């Protein structure tokens, strides 16, 4: 009896070993072999065989690379008085910007425009608290250019405006408080210093969790009503890049493709001197090339100034087209040609330099040109007549 039980146990053991061996040999053949997954990676910034400066002759870029005087009390710019552009050259909705039109285009749908987006059905319920307005300045202009902005439009948008500068200023800190951000970037007006400030602007906007990022310079007047009206025509969750180019054609540059050739890349960029706006949805997509110091790295790889690098990331890398709008204005334009009846409808305004002080918007009736050389105070009083320093309106 014991012998038969022992034999049966051995037989069961042998059967189980054979069965396990069979499973080990058969199962791997029925399974799909494992392959490592490949996940989409951000496209690395390629090297450009070009710059926005000399090769493409952007108005004002060569000037921007120059060092500014170390001491000045002049509120205006150092610019070539002949280097202005006609604001009427920018027509909404045209595919070929080399063709200048005086009226509506025949095919406005081919190129993205503010006009097309103004009928967007997915509009934002936009409040002023949703805006992040970054003002780029330098310590040298705190008591001139920036002081003028603090007296005028910034006084109406204290919680929406953040001042990015390059030096600590206790007087400015007392006036604007935590809205002043010392970037610790160089005070030189160079490509590296400008990109350093833009990198800080981008990171601070991402931290803020606000819906819209708008960048302006310290020589821009921002019409807050027009700005909100414009941005409310779009959805902040979509890819929106709003601005005005300083050229009438996109930049065309050579992009190196490994070692077996090259390809041409073309993109528009919105000039920072007129201001531009970016939706939060698009800003988040820029993160691989713009966040945590990556913006400086990207700018160095392509050797482009700050506003050109923004356009390169958005159009050149992400493939998002810029919405061209004539509502933004820089000191490079002939501002006197802006019709009087439309001045108060613009989003940003600017003014000319010391050699071209007459390049200002044509508004009057409140302050003389001597007392208001930039015309910003006059514009502000027309928009906000209740401002305490504005003269009372004359009653007929």
UniProtKB/Swiss-Prot annotation:
Reactions performed catalytically: 3-O-(alpha-L-fucosyl)-L-threonyl-[EGF-like domain protein] + UDP-N-acetyl-alpha-D-glucosamine = 3-O-(N-acetyl-beta-D-glucosaminyl-(1->3)-alpha-L-fucosyl)-L-threonyl-[EGF-like domain protein] + UDP + H(+); 3-O-(alpha-L-fucosyl)-L-seryl-[EGF-like domain protein] + UDP-N-acetyl-alpha-D-glucosamine = 3-O-(N-acetyl-beta-D-glucosaminyl-(1->3)-alpha-L-fucosyl)-L-seryl-[EGF-like domain protein] + UDP + H(+)
Lineage, broadest ranks: Eukaryota, Metazoa, Chordata, Craniata, Vertebrata
Topology term for the membrane: Single-pass type II membrane protein
GO cellular component, one term: Golgi membrane
Annotated binding of substrate, by residue: 145, 218
Record key words, sorted: Developmental protein, Disulfide bond, Glycoprotein, Glycosyltransferase, Golgi apparatus, Manganese, Membrane, Metal-binding, Signal-anchor, Transferase, Transmembrane, Transmembrane helix
Binding site for Mn(2+): 219, 331
Name the record gives this protein: Beta-1,3-N-acetylglucosaminyltransferase radical fringe
């Amino acid at each position: 009896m014991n012998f038969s039980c022992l034999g049966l146990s051995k037989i069961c053991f042998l059967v189980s070993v054979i069965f396990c061996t069979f499973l080990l040999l058969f199962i791997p053949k029925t399974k799909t072999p494992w392959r490592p997954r490949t996940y989409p990676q951000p496209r690395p910034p390629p090297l450009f065989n070009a710059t926005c400066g000399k090769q493409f002759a952007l108005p004002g870029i060569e000037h921007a690379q120059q060092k500014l005087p170390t001491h000045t009390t002049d509120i205006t710019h150092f610019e070539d008085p002949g280097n202005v552009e006609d604001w009427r050259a920018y027509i909404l909705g045209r595919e070929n910007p080399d063709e200048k039109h005086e009226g509506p285009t025949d095919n406005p749908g081919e190129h993205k425009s503010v006009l097309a987006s103004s009928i967007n059905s997915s509009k934002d319920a936009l409040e002023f608290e949703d805006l992040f307005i970054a003002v780029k300045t330098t310590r040298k202009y705190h008591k001139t250019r920036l002081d003028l902005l603090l007296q005028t439009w910034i006084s109406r948008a204290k919680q929406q405006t953040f001042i990015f500068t390059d030096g600590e200023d206790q007087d400015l800190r007392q006036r604007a408080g935590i809205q002043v951000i010392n970037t610790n970037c160089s005070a030189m007006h160079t490509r590296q210093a400008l990109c350093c400030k833009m990198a800080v602007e981008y990171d601070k906007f991402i931290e803020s969790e606000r819906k819209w990022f708008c960048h302006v310079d310290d020589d821009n007047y921002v019409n807050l009503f027009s700005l909100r009206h414009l941005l409310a025509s779009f959805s902040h969750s979509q890819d929106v890049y709003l601005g005005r180019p300083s050229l009438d054609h996109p930049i065309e540059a050579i992009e190196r493709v490994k070692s077996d050739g090259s390809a041409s890349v073309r993109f528009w960029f919105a000039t920072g001197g007129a201001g531009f706006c970016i939706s939060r949805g698009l800003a988040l997509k820029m993160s691989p090339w713009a966040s945590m110091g990556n913006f400086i790295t990207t700018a160095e790889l392509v050797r482009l100034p700050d506003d050109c690098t923004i356009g390169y990331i958005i159009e050149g890398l992400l493939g998002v087209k810029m919405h061209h709008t004539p509502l933004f204005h820089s000191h490079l334009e002939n501002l006197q040609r802006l019709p009087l009846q439309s001045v108060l409808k613009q989003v940003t305004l600017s003014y000319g330099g010391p050699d071209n002080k007459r390049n200002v918007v044509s508004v009057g009736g409140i302050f003389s040109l001597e007392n208001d050389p930039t015309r910003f105070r006059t514009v502000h009083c027309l928009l906000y007549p209740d401002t305490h320093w504005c003269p009372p309106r004359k009653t007929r």
